[in-house]
Regions:
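Carbohydrate-active catalytic/glycan-binding domains of CAZyme proteins
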Residues: 1-183
Length: 183
């Protein structure tokens, strides 16, 4: 979910039809718009609102079939692409690259992704660039958050990170994870 200029946007995918779409509302407790589709495949899509432009980001493959983060610029009113879809990063080397989110903080673009699948190998990795289109520099200490190979930890499968900034300027990360049920 994203909030921009008084409007909430929820972006997701339909696994049955392989379509990506978003809906919006000015009142999070009220009615939402009809789905607006974007002609870009992948799962776990995200939106970046940046300096008058809107970027649609998802996972996909580059021209050689390598898993990559794919991005295009869109018209937020119609969902129509304003640029071709372009691979911008191949991840930090983990399998199942997904859930890309981009943030423009200061003069730097940060790309946060999930890798490793949503089970025990799940992790959060990131890269950065001076340009929204890259090239993106891999953080050398990826993954930045994981409990993989830490069997005694109560919470496992940590990944799919999304950053949240508080009003005081501090940043936090929200992730998913699971706890084993012992019977």
């Amino acid at each position: 979910i994203r909030f921009h200029e008084g409007r909430f946007y929820m972006v997701t995918n339909n696994n049955t039809t392989s379509e990506n779409f978003y809906v919006y509302t000015d009142d999070i407790y009220g009615e939402w718009s009809e789905p607006i589709t974007v002609d870009q495949g992948g799962i776990d899509p995200s939106l970046l609102f940046d300096q008058g432009h809107v970027y649609f980001i998802s996972n996909g493959q580059d021209e050689h079939g390598v898993n990559s983060v794919i991005q295009c610029e869109i018209d937020i009113e119609t969902g129509k692409k304003l640029s071709p879809s372009k691979p911008i990063w191949q991840g930090a080397g983990g399998r199942y690259l997904e859930s890309p989110h981009m943030y423009h903080i200061g003069n730097t673009y940060y790309l946060v992704v999930a890798e490793g699948g949503t089970e025990y190998g799940h992790m959060v990795s990131y890269s950065r660039s001076d340009n929204v289109w890259g090239p993106f520099e891999n953080y050398p200490h990826n993954p930045v958050l994981t409990n993989r190979n830490k069997a005694p930890e109560e919470i496992q499968g940590i990944g799919h990170g999304d950053l949240v900034q508080k009003a005081d300027g501090s940043w936090y990360i929200m992730t998913l994870g699971f706890r084993q049920i012992h019977k």
